[in-house]
Amino acid sequence: MEHVIVDIAHWKAIFSEIGEGSNKFWEEVYQIGVDHWKEYYDKGFRNIQKILEYVEKTNWYKLNVDSENTFTLILSVSEASKFVSTFFKGFFSRQSRKIEITEEFKKIRIRVV
């Protein structure tokens, strides 16, 4: 089994408990992002918007497309901000284009530079 469905209340409780988390935890989240990039690349995903739409199915966020190169992720749980941001920093670290990721209150902005 590759995925688990987690109730939003559990998701919030998990991140409330984790708090800042250890460096090891965040390094692992980053590396999981890198690994997912390889997996999605092998599946043929190249377009940033399509990738964000695909990951949106996890219910981590609701995607707003601001422009062709700018996206806002409205988080389901604000406590998951660092988790989602760190995952995508790892994920897009393999991208040939520069991607800026900015955390804001209950949302994350992603911009292709």
Model-derived regions: residue spans:
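Arginine residue identity/basic-tract feature
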Residues: 12, 46, 89, 94-97, ...
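N-terminal accessory segment detector
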Residues: 1-67
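Beta-rich nucleic-acid/ligand-interaction surfaces
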Residues: 103-113
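Short, hydrophobic/π-rich interface segment
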Residues: 50-104
